[in-house]
């Protein structure tokens, strides 16, 4: 099936794309919703639906995958917040509808890759939009065990870094910019201590993917800055704002049986 992937830049939407490909689907385009540029604090939009931290790097993410990217500015708010969603003018869900409608028209997709794990709020709204557009939502991570998922993501070579922290035990100075594989033991510890969701499904943290097996090139962060959103003494909320990034060619590892003695000597 021809599939468009709804991406935030984070690990979940990336891993769900990998699951789509493993199931035989073809990712033909990427779709992303972003905050208005003129909005104060536009890096971090107060949205029930969308991750917006890291949105400045999404163009580079699409370039790394060598896929067309469709973007739309989030104009709506969280208006209909009930357990069942019905079409509601001025709701941010309608921005998703317009975005996916465009992608369907341009790319003739039949399915949408969605990285939702636990949020019924998100699932209900994505399903509503997909039903109205006659699209099949593909959510392979839905209600999976989060410890298993995190381990799988790391094992499958998703190179992601922490770009937002918002939980007890997560320190902006220590943890922002840290690779996910290095954070895994600590996240498991926080889960046991404080009930933190290890995949960040409670909004405890957010990530940005710099490389994965689907990328043709990898993203390098040249410079960034820490922005404090809320200086809470126990659970400060802060995020990483990317200032400069570039793409770099990926070097394929040389199999041992193809390496010369000189390669081995210099390794």
Curated annotation (Swiss-Prot):
Reaction it catalyzes: diphthine-[translation elongation factor 2] + NH4(+) + ATP = diphthamide-[translation elongation factor 2] + AMP + diphosphate + H(+)
Keywords from the named record: ATP-binding, Ligase, Nucleotide-binding, Phosphoprotein
EC number: 6.3.1.14
Pathway annotation: Protein modification; peptidyl-diphthamide biosynthesis
Pfam families: Diphthami_syn_2
Domain of life per record: Eukaryota
Gene3D superfamilies: HUPs (3.40.50.620), putative n-type atp pyrophosphatase, domain 2 (3.90.1490.10)
Keyword ATP-binding on entry: yes
GO MF, one annotated term: ATP binding
Modified residues (Phosphotyrosine): 97
GO biological-process terms attached to the record: protein histidyl modification to diphthamide
PANTHER family: DIPHTHINE--AMMONIA LIGASE (PTHR12196:SF2), DOMAIN OF UNKNOWN FUNCTION 71 DUF71 -CONTAINING PROTEIN (PTHR12196)
Physiological role: Amidase that catalyzes the last step of diphthamide biosynthesis using ammonium and ATP. Diphthamide biosynthesis consists in the conversion of an L-histidine residue in the translation elongation factor eEF-2 (EEF2) to diphthamide.
The family this protein is said to belong to: Belongs to the Diphthine--ammonia ligase family.
Name listed for the protein in its UniProt record: Diphthine--ammonia ligase
Biological source species: Bos taurus
């Amino acid at each position: 099936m021809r599939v468009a992937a709804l991406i935030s830049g984070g690990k979940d939407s990336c891993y769900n794309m990998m699951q789509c490909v493993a199931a035989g689907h073809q990712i033909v385009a990427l779709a992303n919703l972003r905050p208005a540029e003129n909005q104060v604090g536009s890096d971090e939009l107060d949205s029930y639906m969308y991750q917006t931290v890291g949105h400045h790097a999404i163009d580079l993410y699409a370039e790394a995958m060598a896929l067309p990217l469709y973007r739309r500015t989030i104009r709506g708010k969280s208006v209909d917040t009930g357990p069942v969603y019905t079409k509601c003018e001025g709701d941010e869900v309608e921005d998703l509808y317009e975005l996916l409608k465009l992608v369907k028209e341009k790319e003739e997709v039949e399915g949408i890759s969605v990285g939702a794990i636990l949020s019924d709020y998100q699932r209900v709204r994505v399903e509503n939009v997909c039903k109205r557009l006659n699209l099949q939502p593909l959510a392979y991570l839905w209600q999976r065990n989060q410890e298993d998922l995190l381990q799988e993501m790391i094992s499958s070579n998703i190179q992601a870094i922490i770009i937002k922290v918002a939980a007890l035990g997560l320190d902006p100075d220590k943890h922002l910019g840290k690779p996910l594989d290095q954070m895994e033991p600590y996240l498991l510890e926080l889960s046991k201590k404080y009930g933190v969701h290890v995949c960040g499904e409670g909004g405890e943290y957010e990530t940005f993917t710099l490389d994965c097996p689907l990328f043709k090139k990898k993203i390098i962060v040249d410079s960034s800055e820490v922005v404090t959103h809320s200086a809470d003494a126990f659970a400060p909320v802060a995020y990483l704002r990317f200032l400069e990034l570039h793409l770099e060619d990926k070097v394929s590892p040389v199999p041992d049986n193809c390496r010369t003695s000189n390669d081995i000597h210099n390794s």
